């Protein structure tokens, strides 16, 4: 866990937040892939609890991509300091039992009261129609959604 004393003053702190549709049926088979637990019912597959687990998966990916930044969801860990706020809003993030998966929504970056950018994303993929195949497809959709999120210019 990151503490306020562990974050140098010159390190950028980015608060990551995820907004999602209300979670659906919780009585189903569960498959865990990456940091996200995917739950399957008769028609669709979701991540439950979606927001917290997807947020953790996104923070892990962002930290690997941008090691000069600290990514948090709870600002108390860094003395309520946030230089930027990265918001992911998912309108859809689901798969059906035939192996079709979709992620749709947008992400935005704010610095202070200013919106730096807002970018939509819409990705669709086909997967092996097994719980593991569908979970891997949903995981790849997270990577695709993250691909539209650029915190700094390339080559920096």
Question: Predicted regions: what is each one?
Answer:
Residues 12-18, 30, 85-89, 102-108, ...:
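Soluble periplasmic/extracytoplasmic beta-strand elements of cell-envelope proteins
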Residues 40-70:
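Mid-chain, structured segments of secreted extracytoplasmic proteins
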Residues 21, 57-68, 144, 148-156:
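Structured segments of extracytoplasmic/periplasmic soluble domains
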Residues 20, 76, 126:
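Residues that form or immediately flank small-molecule/cofactor binding pockets and catalytic motifs
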Residues 1-52, 154-156:
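A structural "domain/chain start" motif
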Residues 1, 65-114:
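Surface-exposed short loop/turn segments
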Residues 8-15, 26, 41, 57, ...:
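Extracytoplasmic
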Residues 38-47, 114-148:
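Short secondary-structure boundary motifs at beta->alpha junctions and helix caps
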